Amino acid sequence: MPELPEVETVRRGLTPAMEGVVIARADVNRPDLRWPFPADMAARLTGKRVERLRRRSKYILMDLDSGETLLVHLGMSGRMLVSGDPLGQFVHSHPAPEKHDHVVFHMANNARITFNDPRRFGAMDLMETASADTHKLLSVLGPEPLGNDFHESHLIEAFKNRNSPVKSVLLDQRIVSGLGNIYVCEALFRAKIHPIRKAGKISGARVATLVPIIREVLAEAIEAGGSSLRDFKQADGELGYFQHSFDVYGREGAPCKGEGCTGQIKRIVQSGRSSFYCAQCQR
């Protein structure tokens, strides 16, 4: 499932084609994805100007001039692909429609944005922009890891007296939003913290080091266009490249990249997810 860097990469790719542009027509080709689409979604999108594209956690939020916001979740295999984006006086051709093109935005600038989702775990919903923060999917989210509300004292307080493994705590979207399996594994390696270590047993000083490390990992991943492991593509159809920089994720049995370390990367399963780590480096 796309994590924060992948969703942010898609948002940045969509912005030039959508922000400030009218949706000339919206095609909704099925009644649902993971959940039913909101009533009259095509009509509520058609003719509306996209005032702003933003991201909250793993959701793309499209603020419209109608006072509504479209929430988009990519799910497991969802992609939002741009075609026909005007370049000077030329317009690139659009690809032929595909079977899993479920929602298509025809923009007034001749761009077309296609939401393609073979596994249909994605989702879309419409809400009032003024009350978007109270939406059931958004109201429970913790601070953004790249924002000012995510700081050392917040994380230290969240870890206090927690018997859960540190990895589980970092994956809790109520504590910090947008983190997923890949980037938690990578951050814990850089912090030299074992993924099964109980969060409440980690010193405040070590917990504090996680904040800049998490930000560093996410910033590097965004710069690389995210990680493409199975389904993820950027808005222009290109793959992400951060997977080539993984220190631990997906590297079971490979030599540890830690300086002077002779260990190998190991894999365990925690709450149904694979955790990758170096037993020599991470304590």
Swiss-Prot record:
Q: Name one GO molecular function term.
A: damaged DNA binding
Write out the similarity annotation: Belongs to the FPG family.
Please give the cofactor(s) recorded in the UniProt entry for this protein.
Zn(2+)
Which top-level group of life is the source organism from?
A: Bacteria
UniProt key word Ribonucleoprotein: no
Which BP terms from GO are recorded? base-excision repair
| Description of how the protein assembles with itself and partners | Monomer.
Organism per entry:
Roseobacter denitrificans (strain ATCC 33942 / OCh 114)
- What positions does UniProt annotate as the active site of this protein? 2 (schiff-base intermediate with dna), 3 (proton donor), 58 (proton donor), 273 (proton donor)
Which NCBIfam families does the UniProt entry name for this protein?
fpg, PRK01103.1
Q: How is the cofactor bound?
A: Binds 1 zinc ion per subunit.
Q: What is its EC number?
A: 3.2.2.23, 4.2.99.18
Key words, A-Z: DNA damage, DNA repair, DNA-binding, Glycosidase, Hydrolase, Lyase, Metal-binding, Multifunctional enzyme, Zinc, Zinc-finger
Entry's PANTHER family?
A: FORMAMIDOPYRIMIDINE-DNA GLYCOSYLASE (PTHR22993:SF9)
What's the protein here called? Formamidopyrimidine-DNA glycosylase
Q: Does the keyword Zinc-finger apply?
A: yes
Q: Give the FPG-type zinc finger regions.
A: 247-283
Residues annotated to bind DNA? 100, 119, 162
Function field = Involved in base excision repair of DNA damaged by oxidation or by mutagenic agents. Acts as a DNA glycosylase that recognizes and removes damaged bases. Has a preference for oxidized purines, such as 7,8-dihydro-8-oxoguanine (8-oxoG). Has AP (apurinic/apyrimidinic) lyase activity and introduces nicks in the DNA strand. Cleaves the DNA backbone by beta-delta elimination to generate a single-strand break at the site of the removed base with both 3'- and 5'-phosphates.
Q: Which Gene3D superfamilies match?
A: 1.10.8.50, MutM-like, N-terminal
Q: Which PROSITE patterns match?
A: FPG_CAT, ZF_FPG_2
Catalyses: Hydrolysis of DNA containing ring-opened 7-methylguanine residues, releasing 2,6-diamino-4-hydroxy-5-(N-methyl)formamidopyrimidine; 2'-deoxyribonucleotide-(2'-deoxyribose 5'-phosphate)-2'-deoxyribonucleotide-DNA = a 3'-end 2'-deoxyribonucleotide-(2,3-dehydro-2,3-deoxyribose 5'-phosphate)-DNA + a 5'-end 5'-phospho-2'-deoxyribonucleoside-DNA + H(+)
